[in-house]
């Protein structure tokens, strides 16, 4: 058992190269909170990339500018206050103990019940810091040895490479898309649910959106349809469509699917993610596509519910929903034969490495010959290279080559470095 003596939080704001568009909105910076913990003489610090727009658009709309980030940071601070003096056997015990009080705290700050993903997003750094001190205490050097017994059957892969999933948001140019295809990309994540400039949710907004989405997918398809890849089962570049809950009805979704069929891209669609907002519980199992749950799935109960609604894949986001919750989610998903993948949240390099560790043991998608992972921070942060310098000394980053990250023994044995001292300690000065 470990006892938590100290749990502190700091934060830094990281600018984005250009406005980052999704869910019909745009971001210009991402706050990085940093949690530092001390447990029985063991220390760890971990960042958390805050994404208010992704985790709860209602908070983003109600509290514009930096106010939403301030609320999420306050939730992290409240968690740290609660954790001091607590003891735990394994870190995954802590989140269930924190959630009820943190939901009440967020309600006090916002005046409404926030999405559970908002709370989980705030806890990513705290959760990884707790796993880090736990690994230090138990001498764990490989991620596979950190995986709880309950998740071991679900995480029995050992990928030697991970296909990189780049993010093709609204503003990515034709030249860049062509370059991605020609340099080895096998699975492109394409943002749909385009903003229309009209009243959000109105009939005009929805109709313009679906027309823009069809045009966008068609333009991308025409750029890369003749490029082959050894990383997919059919040898073609595949598309992962992420609507972030923008679609309003099944009829509107069917308009999109008809457009995809007409352009001859049906066999390219690997995943369609979150076409509808969480409260629109439409059954999608009748369509010949794999629908993927992301922000609507933040617990085992949510995963089971989405599977009943016809969803056949789940986006694991250890770097957004916490490592602890992701262990539970992959277990529930794989028990039902559901596909999984590790998606990004435009996180910093440190969290990207944790995501790689999780992805390296997660089963490959049915359309892929290798595992896969989404990483897009290097294309979006102005200070990506400076943030890489905050990684632990001696930690070797596996770089992309021909569309995939090559994983070796140094990577698989690198957890002891990843859980040790890193550059994020500097945000706390001398304690």
Please give the residue ranges for each predicted region.
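Flexible C-terminal active-site loop/helix
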Residues: 346-431
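Metal-dependent enolase-superfamily TIM-barrel catalytic cores that perform enediolate-based chemistry
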Residues: 148-279
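A general structural motif
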Residues: 272-276, 293-300, 319-325
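Glycine-enriched alpha-helix->loop->beta-strand junction motifs that scaffold or abut catalytic
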Residues: 182-186, 261-268, 286-292, 305-315, ...
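Short, Gly/Pro- and small/polar-rich lid/capping loops
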Residues: 1-36
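Metal- or metallocofactor-binding catalytic centers and their adjacent structured scaffolds
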Residues: 38, 45-138
């Amino acid at each position: 058992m470990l006892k938590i003596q100290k749990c502190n939080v700091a934060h830094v704001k990281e600018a984005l190269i250009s406005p980052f568009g999704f869910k019909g909105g745009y971001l210009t910076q991402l706050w990085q909170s940093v949690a530092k913990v001390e447990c029985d003489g063991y220390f760890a610090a971990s960042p958390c990339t805050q994404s208010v727009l992704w985790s709860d658009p209602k908070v983003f709309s109600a509290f514009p500018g930096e106010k939403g980030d301030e609320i999420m940071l306050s939730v992290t601070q409240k968690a740290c206050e609660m954790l001091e003096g607590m003891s735990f056997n394994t870190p995954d015990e802590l989140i269930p103990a924190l959630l009820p009080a943190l939901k009440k705290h967020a309600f006090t700050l916002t005046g409404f019940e926030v999405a559970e993903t908002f709370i989980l997003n705030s806890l990513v750094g705290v959760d990884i810091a707790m796993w880090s001190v736990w690994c230090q205490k138990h001498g764990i050097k490989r991620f596979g040895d950190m995986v709880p017994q309950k998740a071991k059957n679900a995480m029995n892969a050992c990928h030697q490479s991970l296909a990189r999933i780049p993010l093709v948001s609204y503003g990515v140019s034709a030249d860049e898309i062509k370059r991605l295809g020609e340099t080895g990309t096998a699975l492109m994540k394409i943002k749909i649910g385009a903003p229309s400039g009209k009243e959000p949710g109105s009939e005009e907004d929805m109709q313009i959106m679906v027309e823009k989405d069809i045009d966008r997918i068609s333009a991308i398809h025409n750029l890369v349809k003749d490029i082959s890849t050894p990383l997919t089962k059919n040898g073609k570049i595949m598309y992962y469509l992420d609507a972030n809950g923008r679609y309003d009805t099944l009829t509107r979704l069917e308009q999109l699917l008809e457009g995809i069929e007409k352009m001859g891209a049906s066999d390219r669609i690997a995943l369609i993610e979150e076409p509808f907002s969480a409260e629109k519980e439409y059954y999608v199992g009748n369509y010949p596509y794999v629908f993927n749950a992301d922000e609507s799935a933040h617990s085992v109960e949510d995963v089971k519910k989405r599977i009943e609604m016809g969803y056949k894949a789940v986006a694991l986001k250890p770097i957004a929903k916490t490592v602890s919750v992701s262990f539970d989610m992959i277990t529930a998903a794989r028990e039902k034969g559901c596909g999984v993948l590790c998606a990004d949240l435009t996180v910093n390099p440190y969290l990207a490495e944790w995501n790689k560790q999780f992805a390296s043991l997660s089963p490959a998608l049915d359309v892929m010959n290798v595992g896969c992972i989404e990483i897009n921070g290097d294309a979006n942060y102005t200070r990506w290279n400076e943030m890489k310098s905050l990684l632990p000394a001696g930690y070797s980053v596996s770089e992309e080559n021909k569309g995939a990250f090559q994983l070796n023994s140094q990577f698989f044995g690198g957890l002891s470095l990843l859980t040790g001292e890193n550059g994020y300690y500097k945000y706390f000065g001398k304690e």
